[in-house]
A protein has these predicted regions:
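Conserved short alpha-helical segments that host acidic/polar catalytic motifs at enzyme active sites
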Residues: 1-246, 250, 262-294, 332, ...
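Hydrophobic alpha-helical scaffolding
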Residues: 7-10, 100, 120, 135-139, ...
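Glycine-rich oxoanion-binding loops at beta->alpha junctions
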Residues: 67, 71-84, 273-286, 310-346, ...
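Structural motif
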Residues: 68, 96, 294-296, 342, ...
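Generic C-terminus detector
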Residues: 227, 542, 555-557, 567-608
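Active-site phosphate/pyrophosphate-binding segments
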Residues: 260-264, 268-296, 386-515, 588-608
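Glycine-rich phosphate-binding loops that contact phosphosugars or nucleotide phosphates
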Residues: 290-432, 436-439, 519-563, 583
Length: 608
């Protein structure tokens, strides 16, 4: 959510900042801006709309000369998208510039105090109060001014700051919003995420909570909010910039759909040894696993949907009760956590604000937390007691595909590990499931071969008004994700329902021609699901079914059927989701939607 890029060095800053911001477009934004120091003063340019507008306004940065600057893509929280509300924000004298991700929760009383002191506000944002506070406290010592401001503000922030009378320095600070800094032979960098600066350096430092960084051309210095200097170790990024490029695909989303076989294999391979599942990073003894009395899974969006699937899989295999919570609800409902409970948080970015808050709440109450994340060094990865990385590589499209599949795979392996240790499945069943797990990448390749068939069908529903997804058990979990994929990238109203709930109200919405996507991958629920399909078909619905090979009985209750390869019933989500991802993608493309960057959405939701 929003993006920050900063640079100070020997090169022209504006083109580097624009390039970096372009690598952060996946985070979601509605406007963009830059501040560049030209040797005498700080110049700013802002523009509502796509980054291209700012690029055109500045001729690719060529008409903003200077070797230090900060840039920002804004996702509106306080104040509508506008040039005035766009970042950077300045003090009244134009000598201090600030870019900010996050929310200053006490900005209203702070704003009033600054207005009472004569400061003039021009925007509706919470960020502008930072610029005026910095001006108020600045007496020639930037670090002192920044730390005084940080002691007064409440909320979350990632900051990039410039002072006109400090031409050889820029500053960064962080609390509860992601931020990294990096260094190369040609300068130093600030960024919200690695892809923004990977073209220029592989050496990065993760800024921790309530830390301030002073960046100069050849050096980085780290400080606490109490101005104590901190020693930090760099991290070398081991994937290259090409992994974050389209590689010939029309969209990142399509590329990432096709990367799922590799993603699943990369998640599985390091954790299978001698026909057993070994999760060394779990840091739990067999005795500790046996003592688990309940698991709480906490996540948001698609990650929450993987948690819903995991509930069925873990309860079915390991016989451990599982509760799944939307992260934004978890911490506010005063959850009952008892001895023997385990908390699992799931997040692709490792920076999801609500999930991070749930992690901290759980740890404060004395419970160990396992994080399932994709981004190495992210906040959740650093703060969780143990971490399972999904090794999906960079996922650029806002709508998750391969990270979702990797999360599912990690959860399958966790469930199987727990079941084997607790003795709730025998060796024969475990070995069979391990074989099925290893087959998933090849089976997904087969499903991807049906692309043209699915595209042809999707083109028929480009103009749909409503689409419903139904399923039972694990199929309900698949329905949740299929519906979310469709609505977030095509803007078609879509809902997912437990199939048995249709008759309790939702069936009144079915009319002639309404598309109902029915998931039927669970053999013990086939007949019940078919009954629900017949009910909607009798009311004029067009029924698209997704089921496993051999389930020919479903054809009489369907108008269109997609068959997936046969696998263990607990793993069907990984296969059934593929045609739903492709269907959503081609509907969105047919409607002319911005598939990789849907309106109003952000890849990493870093505010609560």
């Amino acid at each position: 959510m929003c993006g920050i890029v900063g640079y100070i060095g020997t090169e022209q800053a504006a083109p580097i900042i624009l390039d970096g911001l372009s690598k952060l477009e996946y985070r979601g934004y509605d406007s963009a801006g830059m501040a560049i120091f030209d040797g005498e003063k700080i110049n700013t340019r802002k523009a509502v709309g796509r980054l291209k507008v700012l690029e055109n306004l500045t001729h690719g940065g060529e008409n903003m000369k200077g070797t230090s600057g900060i840039g920002h893509t804004r996702w509106a929280t306080h104040g509508a998208p506008s040039d005035i509300n766009s970042h950077p924000h300045m003090n009244n004298a134009g000598t201090i510039a600030v870019v900010h991700n996050g929310i200053i929760e006490n900005y209203i009383p702070l704003k009033k105090k600054m207005q009472d002191k004569g400061y003039q506000f021009v925007s509706e944002t919470d960020t502008e109060v930072l610029a005026h506070l910095l001006d108020y406290y600045y007496k020639g010592n930037p670090l002192e001014a920044i730390t005084k401001v940080l002691h007064r503000v409440e909320g979350s922030y990632a900051l990039g700051i410039m002072f006109a009378d400090q031409p050889d320095k820029i500053f960064a600070a962080r609390k509860d919003s992601p931020l990294i800094v990096g260094k190369s032979d040609n300068g130093s960098f600030i960024a919200s995420d690695v892809p923004a600066i990977l073209k220029y350096t592989r050496t990065v430092y993760y800024v921790d909570n309530q830390e301030v960084v002073e960046l100069q051309q050849g050096s980085l210095r780290f400080f606490s909010v109490d101005e104590e200097e901190i020693e930090k170790q760099p991290v070398t990024i081991d994937w290259d910039a090409n992994a974050a490029e389209k590689a010939g695909y029309e969209h990142f989303m399509l590329k990432e759909i096709y990367e799922q076989p590799k993603t699943i294999n990369d998640t599985i391979s390091p954790r299978i040894k001698d026909n057993d599942i070994v999760i060394e990073e779990l840091n739990m003894s067999d005795e500790e696993i046996k003592e688990i009395t309940k698991i709480h899974i906490v996540a948001c969006g698609s990650a929450y949907h993987t948690g819903v699937t995991a509930k069925y899989v873990i309860e079915g295999l390991a016989r451990i009760p599982v509760e799944v919570d939307v992260a934004s609800e978890f911490r506010y409902r005063d959850p009952i956590l008892q001895k023997g409970n385990m908390v699992i948080v799931i997040s692709q970015s490792g920076e999801t604000a609500d999930t991070l808050a749930a992690l901290r709440e759980s740890r404060e109450r004395g419970f160990k937390v396992l994080g399932i994340v994709n981004v190495v060094g992210s906040s959740i990865a650093r703060e969780a007691d143990s971490v399972m990385y999904t090794w999906a590589g960079p996922e650029i499209a806002v709508a998750t595909t391969k990270a979702y599949s990797a999360q599912l795979t990690a959860l399958y392996m966790l469930a199987m590990k727990f079941a084997r240790v607790r003795g709730t499945i025998d060796q024969e069943k475990f070995a069979g499931m391990l074989t099925d797990l290893r087959c998933l990448p090849d089976q997904i390749e087969l499903l991807l071969g049906q692309k043209e068939k699915i595209q042809h069908f999707a083109n028929r529903y480009v103009g749909a008004r409503d689409i419903f997804f139904i399923g039972r058990g694990i199929d309900y979990a698949i329905s949740l994700e299929g519906s979310l994929k469709l609505k977030e990238i095509s803007y078609i109203h879509s809902e997912a329902y437990a199939a048995g709930e249709l008759k309790h109200g939702t069936i009144s919405l079915i009319e002639d021609g309404t598309l109902v996507v029915a998931l039927a991958t669970q053999p013990d629920l086939f007949q019940k699901t078919i009954s629900n399909m017949v009910e909607v078909k009798a009311r004029g619905a067009f029924v698209m079914a997704v089921t496993i090979e051999g389930n020919k009985a479903i054809e009489k209750a369907s108008d269109y059927v997609i068959y997936t390869p046969e696998t263990n019933p607990y793993f069907t989500n990984s296969l059934a989701i593929i045609p739903l991802q492709l269907f959503s993608y081609y509907v969105a493309v047919g409607r002319g939607c911005d598939v990789d960057k849907p309106r109003n959405l952000a890849k990493s939701v870093t505010v609560e």
